[in-house]
């Protein structure tokens, strides 16, 4: 008799100017991820999907940084995660509907620069299901090295803390991006993979049908892990940033 797998799947999407081809590819081939999950024929899957679409801009000669992050239902994601304590707010995060996910992804527009590890930390703060039977999966997609974005040094300094957090949450991290010493260091996290791809073309050369199918197979073959101990939220202090409409601003 088939068992039932459980997975929370988050796409961490660099939404900088060049990334439109990536959005198109994920929309077209998300079903390949699900097919990969089911390829062994042993499980039905209880799946929840969401994304963190993020971009960053610098103003006033770098003295002000504006972070923009949205999810499938939340236009102002930082407020949703860190400032609204109501439990019912969690209902606005995640969907079990692939068509709903694809529809929301279709409305994303690229623009700005990137701070991928701040976005990754935000993904890690989602209300992931804590049980030992839940696979917690983050798929990070970017066409720029960590070293060419904004807030570079701050992100590099937080890599050890991010690895600790990934381990505590039992997260499977899949990174698809160009060659980067920072991403390479982050890939030392247990159960993480890092596929190096060409820089700067919106991941247009990536075979997303194959890649997402393979990620699905890897998740299916993995062992879910329980969340261990307490986990520090908002490693970059994003829970304290001043919000303004759909942006989060803080002085450099």
What are these regions (language model features)?
Residues 1-252:
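Divalent cation-coordinating acidic motifs and surrounding scaffolds
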């Amino acid at each position: 008799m088939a068992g039932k797998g459980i997975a929370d799947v988050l796409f961490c999407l660099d939404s900088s100017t060049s990334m439109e081809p990536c959005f198109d590819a994920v929309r077209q081939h998300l079903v390949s991820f699900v097919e990969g999950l089911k390829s062994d024929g042993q499980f039905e899957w209880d799946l929840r999907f969401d994304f963190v679409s993020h971009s960053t801009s610098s103003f006033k000669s770098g003295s002000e940084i504006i972070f923009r992050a949205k999810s499938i239902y939340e236009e102002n994601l930082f407020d949703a995660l860190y400032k609204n304590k109501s439990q019912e707010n969690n209902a606005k995060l995640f969907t079990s509907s692939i068509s709903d996910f694809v529809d929301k992804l279709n409305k994303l527009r690229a623009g700005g620069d990137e701070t991928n590890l701040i976005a990754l930390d935000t993904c890690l703060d989602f209300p992931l299901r804590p049980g030992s039977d839940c696979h917690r999966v983050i798929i990070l997609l970017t066409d720029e090295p960590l070293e060419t974005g904004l807030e570079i040094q701050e992100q590099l300094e937080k890599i050890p803390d991010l690895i600790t957090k990934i381990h505590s949450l039992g997260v499977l991290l899949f990174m698809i991006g160009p060659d980067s010493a920072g991403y390479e260091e982050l890939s030392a996290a247990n159960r993480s993979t890092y596929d190096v791809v060409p820089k700067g073309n919106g991941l247009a050369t990536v075979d997303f049908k194959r890649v997402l199918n393979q990620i699905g197979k890897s998740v299916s073959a993995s062992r879910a892990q329980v969340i261990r101990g307490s986990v520090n939220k908002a490693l970059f202090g994003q829970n304290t940033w001043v919000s303004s409409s759909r942006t989060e601003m803080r002085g450099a």
